[in-house]
Swiss-Prot record:
Record site feature (Important for activity), residues: H99
Superkingdom as given in the UniProt entry: Bacteria
Pfam families registered for this protein in UniProt: GlutR_dimer, GlutR_N, Shikimate_DH
Gene label: hemA
Leading EC class: oxidoreductase
UniProt KW keywords: NADP, Oxidoreductase, Porphyrin biosynthesis
Name the record gives this protein: Glutamyl-tRNA reductase
Organism phylogeny: Bacteria, Bacillati, Bacillota, Bacilli, Bacillales
Binding site for substrate: T49, C50, N51, R52, S109, E114, T115, Q116, Q120
Family to which this protein belongs: Belongs to the glutamyl-tRNA reductase family.
Annotated catalysed reactions: (S)-4-amino-5-oxopentanoate + tRNA(Glu) + NADP(+) = L-glutamyl-tRNA(Glu) + NADPH + H(+)
Enzyme Commission identifier(s): 1.2.1.70
Note: During catalysis, the active site Cys acts as a nucleophile attacking the alpha-carbonyl group of tRNA-bound glutamate with the formation of a thioester intermediate between enzyme and glutamate, and the concomitant release of tRNA(Glu). The thioester intermediate is finally reduced by direct hydride transfer from NADPH, to form the product GSA.
Role this protein plays: Catalyzes the NADPH-dependent reduction of glutamyl-tRNA(Glu) to glutamate 1-semialdehyde (GSA).
Pathway this chain belongs to: Porphyrin-containing compound metabolism; protoporphyrin-IX biosynthesis; 5-aminolevulinate from L-glutamyl-tRNA(Glu): step 1/2
């Protein structure tokens, strides 16, 4: 049994390759079911977003597992393997486990520390659970990874502070005004940067939105998205008097708001603070405006400096999380190592319980006059003796499972307790149950062959 991750992401493949290997979200369950039918695949979860497509799989052999995952991708997307193989990254064993923890924690994302990927991984995992493509190993691993990601975000600053210019503008506005509730934000320019800024401010609860643009129709279109009002450039001075926050992003080659205009506006505002963000290049606002009282002016370089400082904070947090992941990988490996000892412990317990039951039967035959209460007392104490005797051997068996010579030591353990045949029966029963689980999962599918997405 081996764990692998086969996939590509924004680091390894350009968007024109990523879009060819991107699963439609509604077809992910169908894709995982189709992959589960492939040779060598024991469990699988597929994670597919705009920035990554990754197949997490438990396989019986590494070489065949890699081969059949690649072939599955080729068949599903109707692409020759050689057209995308060079963009794939393959991770195995500890590296594969570590990668999942990094992805869920957001430290492998384009936006360091983002949490959207955690929800996407969780959704794929829950889908795999529902349709039966996950089993003992991935049920444990993905639950551990999701739990860890939440803890990492709670215990570090990985998700704090803005790492985009538009978010930095919101962060600054909150520092100046505290709450943005009932604040009036005006946007000068109806381009993409202005839209991003207003989107983030609107999401933070601003009360009123005004869009000012040379082309009134564009102003109307953008304002409608945020239940705001549109104004022409002729109404700029009035908007400066009314707004609490102004964000400028025009394509003008000279200052749209000069020092003299703002001197006049500032006097009429009578000390009311105005937060101004100039994200235009060239700048829309005369930098001397920042010298006026109660005017807080920031340009693109100021915001970029904040973003870089915040990103450095997140990178330090990411380093801390990477250290934490090392402990998580060890913890998962320790858990996996106990899987081999499960049938041994189960067989030992069953033998001990059988001896206890046979002993009770013998006692009852020789002492037929025992009351029900006496039988219960004897049963309770004989079971207690059995449990106390088993405690140390079970602990030893678990330690053996972590030993480099685990197979030899566990074989000797089975011989000492005379449970070799019982262990083999336990292994066969567990294998049978796993096969039945897979058959039940496949039975829920339609009788038709999987529909591939072209």
């Amino acid at each position: 049994m081996h764990t692998i991750v086969v996939g590509l992401n924004y680091k390894t493949a350009p968007v024109e390759i990523r879009e060819k290997l991107s699963f439609i979200e509604s077809e992910l369950p169908q894709a995982m079911e189709a992959l589960q039918k492939q040779k060598s695949i024991l469990e699988n979860v597929i994670v597919s977003t705009c920035n990554r497509t990754e197949i997490y799989a438990v396989v019986d052999q590494l070489h065949t597992g890699r081969h059949f995952v690649k072939q599955f991708l080729a068949d599903w997307f109707d692409l020759p393997v050689e057209t995308f193989s060079s963009y794939l990254t393959i991770r195995e064993e500890d590296e594969a486990v570590e990668h999942l923890f990094k992805v869920t924690a957001g430290i492998d994302s384009m936006v360091l520390g983002e949490t959207q990927i955690l929800g996407q991984v969780k959704k794929s995992f829950l889908s795999g659970q529902e349709i039966g493509t996950t089993g003992t190993v991935y049920n444990q691993l993905f639950k551990q990874a999701v739990t860890f990601a939440k803890r990492a975000h709670n215990e570090t600053a990985i998700g704090e502070n803005a790492v985009s210019v538009s978010y930095a503008a919101v962060e600054l506005a909150k520092k100046i005004f505290g709450s943005l509730q009932r604040k009036h934000v005006a946007i000068l320019g109806a381009g993409k940067m202005g839209e991003l800024a207003i989107e983030n401010l609107y999401g933070s609860g601003v009360g009123k939105v005004t869009v000012i643009n040379r082309t009134f129709e564009k102003a109307e279109s953008l304002a409608a998205k945020f239940h705001g009002q549109a104004k022409s450039m002729k109404e700029l001075q009035c908007s400066l008097l009314e707004a609490d926050i102004l964000i400028t992003s025009t394509g003008a080659t000279d200052y749209v708001i000069d020092y003299e205009l703002m001197q006049f506006v500032e006097r009429l505002r009578k000390g009311k603070p105005l937060f101004m963000v100039d994200i235009a290049v060239p700048r829309d606002i005369d930098p001397r405006v920042g010298d006026l009282p109660n005017v807080f002016l920031y340009d693109i370089d100021d915001l970029q400096g904040i973003v870089e400082a915040n990103l450095a904070e997140r990178e330090r947090a990411a380093a801390d999380i990477t250290d934490m992941i090392g402990h998580e990988v060890i913890q998962f490996k320790d858990w996996v190592s106990t899987l081999g000892v499960v049938p041994v412990i189960s067989a030992l317990r069953k033998k001990a319980n059988r001896i206890q039951e046979e002993t009770m039967t013998s006692i009852e035959n020789k002492m037929p006059d025992l009351t029900e209460r006496e039988r219960k007392i004897l049963s309770k104490h004989t079971k207690s003796i059995i449990n106390q005797l088993l405690k140390e051997p079970i602990l030893q068996a678990k330690e053996m499972a972590n030993s480099p010579k685990a197979n030899e030591q566990l074989r000797l353990f089975q011989q000492i307790f005379g449970i070799e045949e019982a262990v083999e029966a336990e292994v066969q029963e567990m294998t049978k149950q796993e096969l039945e689980r897979k058959e039940r999962a496949q039975a829920t599918q339609t009788s038709a062959e999987p529909k591939y997405s072209f």
